[in-house]
Amino acid sequence: MLSICSRVARIVPAVAALLVLACAALLVLAGCGAPALAPDGTSLAALGRARSDVPKLGGCSIFPSDNPWNTDISESSVDPNSANYLAAMNADTTNLHPDFGHDKHYGIPVTLAPKKTPFVPMKFFSYPDQSDPGPYPFPKNTQIEGGKNATGDRHALVVGEVNCHLYETYDTHYVGPGWRAANGAVFDLSSDKLRPDCWTSADAAGLPITPALVKYDEVQNGEIDHAMRFTVATTQAAYQHPATHYASSITNPNEPPMGMRVRLKASFDTSGFTGESLVILTALKKYGMFLADNGSDWYISGATATRWNDNDLDQLKTVSASNFEVIQLGQLYTDC
């Protein structure tokens, strides 16, 4: 916008000052001069290049365009400690693994709560002091990770269409008329606001889960336009924003911190890949993925869908994690 105004100003010098003032006002109204900030005031836009559009789910935009989940990091600098981080994550001996597939109990489901969904009580039994209080708009048929009788993480992810807020819980159980969970977090999808420092969420890193999931419809449309989520077995007792929490007592500086972002190298040859795997690998070069939890090494999270083609996804299992690089880290937080 400023470049256009500058050209006109050179043509008509008499109105140059007025044009500069007008363009500045337009930029303020457009929000161009107000980058997303972390709790400490650090600009999150520095993590990558913002864009003009954002992913959508259930009629809701998934965070603003300058949010870290939506930024292009294909040209971001590589961290000088990248090789050591990769070694700690067993990159040379581990391949990617899609933690989702066609089985209805595989992956993490997302529930869309229509605008008329009632808000019901939500009680927390493990981390109430780090949870956002209820009520939550959880329908009685809210989908649970692994199914209603699952014994695993039992994540519940709900997009409330009435206010475009994201509600995520861990170890979730229906008790009628409401729910109980180990902990819960609420994210305003129109805001860049992070959770308080040292607070967890339904994810160990204090991050939202839903924006990170590989979703069937977006893959079928040919493009994933956001960062993804992955796990490794051991992490450092540290995090960087947008993460707000760590889940480790390890102080080795070569161990990966929560919120670390990795990217598939631009030089990695994807010409032999097809279908769903090709779409995922292409996005990993552009948006990468955040380290979000302790778990199996290099497992990528996806949404539940019986339409996934497992044979297609299995191509990812041939990709060595050594083909990734760690993006330049920002400030690390270690005092929780």
Predicted regions and their residues:
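N-terminal secretory signal peptides that target proteins for export/translocation
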Residues: M1-A14
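Intrinsically disordered, low-complexity sequence elements enriched in Ser/Thr/Gly/Pro
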Residues: C5-V8, L37, L47-R49
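Short, surface-exposed polybasic-aromatic patches that bind anionic ligands, especially phosphate groups
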Residues: G41-C336
